[in-house]
Amino acid sequence: MLAKEYPTKEKLLEAEPDFVYASYNSAFGDEGVGDRADWQKLGVGTYISPAGCPAQTRQAKLAIGDVFTEIRELAAIFGVSDRGEKLIADHEGRIATAAGTARNVKVMWWDGGSDAPSVGACCGAPNMIMSAAGVTNAFADLTGSWGDTSWETVTDRNPEVIVLVDASWDPAAQKKTFLAGHRTLKDLPAVKQQWYVVIPFSSTTAGVRNVLGVEALAQGIAALPSGAPS
């Protein structure tokens, strides 16, 4: 590992890369590894995930097909197209199986934030995962990949299930404690009954691990105890 966050351009140069792959355009910014054009001049190829590419607009909904496009393109770049197609076929089958186990319930995807919760909106990886799992996004009317809302709106929409994104800087256990202690949220059925599904952060950004997010969501809902929404 070169750095806990983005390495500096100098640090990456020391590694003598042939190719630089990034999930987000910010990796090639001033606080990242530098401009892509500079790497091209050095003979180093670069690639940004289609979900993070600046040419893409997140007013257009991200779809599982976009993730498969990324797998296909990277497999072609490295000359392993057959392996890419096998991986895509495997993911397609796993997603279809997962979707067959889920119940279509109204889900709030809580990424983080306590004053103004950041939730899965219309067009990013959270909505893509929810759609693939066959559930309804309670905040699909918000624009962008993630959107800020209010706890009053959450109460009004009364999600049947709440996804808790588990990150080292904002763990799911901490989110549960917050919900249970909130003066109004604690009375929501989903909070009182702990109708939660915990999904690791690594599965919630667009990429090869999204299949794990779809499986975790579908299986988590299917495993909710008797009396849970159906």
Map each language-model feature to its residues:
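Proline-aspartate-enriched helix->loop->beta-strand connector
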Residues: 9-22, 151-167
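Structured C-terminal subdomain patch of bacterial secreted/periplasmic proteins
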Residues: 61-70, 161-230
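Short beta-strand and adjacent tight-turn residues that come in two discontinuous sequence segments
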Residues: 4, 22, 49, 140, ...
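A short, structured surface patch at a secondary-structure boundary
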Residues: 1-28, 138
